[in-house]
Every structure is written in structure tokens, then in C-alpha cells.
Curated annotation (Swiss-Prot):
GO terms for biological process: proteolysis. It comes from Chlamydia felis (strain Fe/C-56) (Chlamydophila felis). Its cofactor is Mn(2+). It catalyses: Release of an N-terminal amino acid, Xaa-|-Yaa-, in which Xaa is preferably Leu, but may be other amino acids including Pro although not Arg or Lys, and Yaa may be Pro. Amino acid amides and methyl esters are also readily hydrolyzed, but rates on arylamides are exceedingly low; Release of an N-terminal amino acid, preferentially leucine, but not glutamic or aspartic acids. This is Probable cytosol aminopeptidase.
Length: 500
């Protein structure tokens, strides 16, 4: 994907469908933040009568043939002294939404005067690029026409920046968003198409694309041989075989530092015998968003050739129903040897993650484990669609993730591992139950996973992305449906804190 181009001079720009001009809000007035594109000044001066320049405010007007573009988009950036990176991202995401609705495919963007910016030019450009890329995406529709009524942007030329500086940022963000789009495509895809085997094939494809990536796929027989009794139990009711995916990237082979990403890969969740209501099942193709996130992150890390070692582990299965489905009240033994009494077959995600954690500890020698899962409805109730809750046994890891969250705008909120709630997982007939009481569900789910670390000195974080992975409405800077949430944040974390 090469969408972005750059040019130092506005005067020599090529023709385009639209030009985007930035504006500052200065007390009660509005001022163009860029070096004036003179031919358009009379036109936009008229439009400024009803334009305040607030952050994200936008107005699209016609140029009436007076320049090289057919339309002019006035884009408010608010007050310069208050400008944040997230403001930039959201403003240009909104601009993208407006331009696509107007069927503009080629766009010239004039940067503000660099010396006036409160944030660095690199930061501004990076977030501008991310904002545009985030909404330059189409949900894979299954209509007869198979075409979106809003065409994608095909060429974006950023004016007022030295190409040598800009192009490096563009290529980096484009590589990251290849991972975001991969995540979105997998989450948005039909559950009958995005099966465990499909996820395995995606992993194999990444191994072919990147020389430093290797894929290992365990089939049903290999899963049983490894005594992954929890993953095997969840898979019992499905006509589709499970698989266990191990995708390894070696960017620094001599280093012992090793990050393991674990993604919940339930490709469709009926709830099992503890059947979900029909309405709750409508979006359950998204229950493999953790797996898709792990694949998207590893894709981005490999594309950027970061000097780190990262392994993505994906336990993949459906949670379906037939006469062989695993049953409530029964006890199953995981790869760790720990036994679990099934209090609900709809608490299946933590079961397959438990076997994945055990596998990582046995074979991968991880420095840290970070898991991603659409795990609990309790998290959606607590934090909604805009914030993902996370838990960690390590303050340094938690702080670094929080900083990455703040820098990328993908909001994470650390929640406590309340020790006394662990008692809710006690069982009279097994080492533990897979559900606690009807309270603090997100916390008890995290405490369940922590048990499988078995006191090993491994930093661990659990991200419950149940609310953020799939959105019911458009809200800048995310499209409706799959968001790709977490990919940018974790790539930033890996690059900043681990690429040393």
C-alpha cells in the first residue's frame, strides 16, 4: 500500500479532487494555519463567516475552477496552544469521512506552518497519516454490487514538508495499518469463512511474506497429544476442527528477550450448551478478535523489521453445539495438569487461553506474555466501546502499556487484580471453576488466567477488548464494526520499550 506522497512546495502541486486547508481558532477569530494558497483566499474568507475553527470542525466548499482542486475542505484544529496528537488524528479522520462521502479520491493536504506547531512535525504528520488511514477502509460487503458508495482515497499528497522526512513516516504508518486492516478484515469476515483453518492459513501466509517469520500449526491430533484438554473440550461441539497456531518473528535472534502475544481465537461463539440469546449471538463472529489482533501486531512488527523477538500464539476453535458438546458440571484437565469444573460453557475463552499460556511457558521461554481477548460482557458494561480494561502482575509492563495507550489514543485502563475475589473460583471437585460469582466478572476472568502462570517470574498483561474490538456505530477515528483496536498501541509499545 502506497497512498501517501509529499511535496515541499504548494505551488507545484498536481491537480486533485480536493484540497484540505488547516485553520487555527484565535480568540474570537479564525486564521489559516498554512502558508496562504492565494487563489483560494477569497473563497474561504466568505466561508469563514460560519466557521469557528474548532477542533475537528469541517466545511467543504467548491473552488469554482479557481485552482487545481475542485473542492476545498476547511479543517479546524482548534487553539494551537491546546493542540494534542489525538486532536490531529481525529480531525483528519473526520476530514477523510467527509471527503469519501463527497466521492473525492485524490486529495492535496496543506500542512500548518511547522514552526508554529505545539507538537513536533513528526508527531503531527504521524497522527495525520493515522487519522486518514483509519477511515480509508471499507467493510467487506456482500451485496450484489460489492461496491461501497464511498470510494477510497487513492492518492494523498501532503504539501509543505520535505519528502525525505515525510516519506519515512508515511511508509511506517502504512505498514502498521496493513496490520490494522488485516485484523479488521478477519473480524468482519463471515464466521463460516474465517474458521480456525483460515487463521492458520493467514499465519502461513505471513511466514511466506516475511523471511524472519515462522509458522507452526498444531492440528486436532497434535492438540490432544499435548494434552490441551481445555481447548479440546471447547472444540468438541464443532464440526470444524480446532487448531493451535504458533507464529514466531525473530528480529533479534541472539537476544533472550521474548514477547509472547496470545489471542483468543473463538471463530464463532454460540455459548455452547449454555446457549446465548439470539440477539447476543449476532456479533459472535467477532469472538476471534484477540487472534486477529495478535496477527495484525505481528504483521506490523515484521513489516517494520523491529529488532525484537515476538511470538503470536492462537488457540482457535468454534464454540458450537451438538451431542458431543462439553458439558456444565463436568471437569476437564488442561495442559498444565490443573483441572477445571465447567460452571458455564459460555466462559470458553479463558479455557483456551489457559492452555495457550501453559504452552508458552513450556516452549517459548517468555520474558512477558500479553493476551488479547473479547472475554467478558462485564468489561463492556464497565468501560463501553472506547476503552479497554487491562490487568497486569507487573507495574513496569502496565506503565509502559499505559504510555503506549496515551501516545496512540487507543485507550487502556488498568483494573485491579483483587485477591479476595480469587475465592470465587474455588471448586469442591476440581482445582477451580471457570466462572466466579455474578459480580466482578472481568476481574475473576483475569484471576482465572493468572492461575495458569503458576507463579513463574513472567510479566503478564491481559487486555479484555470485548467492548473495543467491534463497534456498533461510526465514531471517529474508527469505522463501524471491526476497529482493529490494539494493533497500533502494541506496535508502539514494542517499538519504544523493547526495540533496544
Amino acid at each position: 500500500m502506497v497512498l501517501f506522497h509529499s511535496q515541499a512546495s504548494c505551488c507545484k502541486r498536481v491537480k486533485a479532487d480536493a484540497i484540505v486547508l488547516p485553520f487555527w481558532q484565535v480568540q474570537d477569530k479564525v486564521r489559516c494555519a498554512a502558508s496562504i494558497v492565494e487563489e483560494y483566499e477569497p473563497l474561504y474568507q466568505v466561508a469563514l463567516e460560519n466557521f469557528a475553527g474548532k477542533t475537528g470542525e469541517a466545511e467543504l466548499i467548491y473552488s469554482y475552477g479557481q485552482g487545481k482542486e475542485k473542492r476545498i475542505l476547511l479543517l479546524g484544529l482548534g487553539k494551537n496552544e491546546e493542540l494534542s496528537s489525538q486532536d490531529v488524528l481525529e480531525a483528519y479522520a473526520k476530514a477523510t469521512r467527509i471527503l469519501r462521502k463527497a466521492k473525492c479520491t485524490t486529495v492535496n493536504i496543506v500542512l500548518p506552518v511547522i514552526s508554529e506547531l505545539r507538537i513536533s512535525a513528526e508527531d503531527f504528520l504521524s497522527n495525520l497519516t493515522s487519522g486518514i488511514l483509519s477511515l480509508n477502509y471499507n467493510y467487506p460487503k456482500y451485496t450484489k454490487e460489492c461496491q461501497s458508495s464511498e470510494p477510497l482515497l487513492t492518492k494523498v499528497t501532503v504539501l509543505g514538508i520535505v519528502p525525505k522526512i515525510a516519506d519515512r513516516i508515511f511508509r511506517k504508518e502504512e505498514s502498521i495499518f496493513e496490520g490494522v486492516y488485516l485484523t479488521r478484515d478477519l473480524v468482519n469476515g463471515n464466521a463460516d469463512e474465517v474458521t480456525p483453518q483460515k487463521l492458520a492459513n493467514i499465519a502461513k501466509g505471513l511466514a511466506k511474506e516475511f523471511p524472519s517469520v515462522d509458522a507452526k500449526i498444531l492440528n486436532k491430533d497434535a492438540i490432544l497429544k499435548e494434552k490441551m484438554g481445555l481447548l479440546a473440550a471447547v472444540a468438541k461441539g464443532s464440526a470444524v476442527d480446532p487448531c493451535f497456531i504458533v507464529l514466531s518473528y525473530q528480529g533479534k535472534p541472539k537476544s533472550k528477550d521474548h514477547t509472547v502475544l496470545i489471542g483468543k481465537g473463538v471463530t464463532f461463539d454460540s455459548g455452547g450448551l449454555d446457549l446465548k440469546p439470539g440477539k447476543a449471538m449476532l456479533t459472535m463472529k467477532e469472538d476471534m478478535a484477540g487472534a486477529a489482533t495478535a496477527l495484525g501486531i505481528l504483521s506490523g512488527v515484521a513489516a517494520l523489521e523491529l529488532p525484537v523477538n515476538v511470538t503470536a500464539i492462537i488457540p482457535a476453535t468454534e464454540n458450537a453445539i451438538d451431542g458431543a458438546s462439553y458439558k456444565m458440571g463436568d471437569v476437564y484437565i488442561g495442559m498444565s495438569g490443573l483441572s477445571v469444573e465447567i460452571g458455564s460453557t459460555d466462559a470458553e475463552g479463558r479455557l483456551i487461553l489457559a492452555d495457550a499460556i501453559t504452552y508458552a511457558l513450556k516452549y517459548c521461554k517468555p520474558t512477558r506474555i500479553i493476551d488479547f481477548a473479547t472475554l467478558t460482557g462485564a468489561m463492556v458494561v464497565s468501560l463501553g466501546e472506547s476503552v479497554a480494561g487491562f490487568f497486569s502482575n507487573n507495574d513496569v509492563l502496565a506503565q509502559d502499556l499505559s504510555e503506549a495507550s496515551a501516545e496512540t489514543g487507543e485507550a487502556l485502563w488498568r483494573l485491579p487484580l483483587v485477591e479476595k475475589y480469587d475465592k470465587a473460583l474455588q471448586s469442591d471437585i476440581a482445582d477451580m471453576k471457570n466462572i466466579g460469582s455474578n459480580r466482578a466478572g472481568a476481574i475473576t476472568a483475569a484471576l482465572f488466567l493468572r492461575r495458569f502462570l503458576e507463579d513463574q517470574p513472567v510479566a503478564w498483561a491481559h487486555l479484555d477488548i470485548a467492548g473495543t474490538a467491534y463497534r456498533e456505530k461510526d465514531e471517529d477515528p474508527y469505522p463501524k464494526y471491526a476497529s482493529g483496536f490494539g494493533v497500533r498501541c502494541l506496535i508502539y509499545y514494542i517499538e519504544k520499550f523493547l526495540s533496544k
